[in-house]
Amino acid sequence: VIKIEVKASRAVDFDSSEPLYVKALAFDSNKRFDMNFQQVKPACCDVFVWVGVWRDVIKYWVLSAREVQNNRYYSAGQHRGNVGEGQLHVKNSNITEFMCYQSTPRDLILNIRAAYQRQYTQ
């Protein structure tokens, strides 16, 4: 049994104060974006499936829990006094570092199994 935590986030204009539905960006936008994957709990799962949503594109990333916990962008302790839970921001400035985890919908099962293997063999 593979324990999976699925998180989704929208790519939104980082520099806008408009409501989320207004500042949602298209994939080919040149504006700075921020996707905040919140309440991430690496100790509670084996694999993460992250869904990044733009107005016109959906991207999937599959990471082992260890890959998330050890990622330099992972921030443990999202809220004061919180234990075992954090957040990770995927932005225009770091998205290329997550390309190796990207998956097509068709390959999600294969990539989930591969991430599970990485979780327990590396």
For the regions a protein language model found, what residue spans apply to each?
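Nucleic-acid endonuclease domains
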Residues: 2-3, 8-122
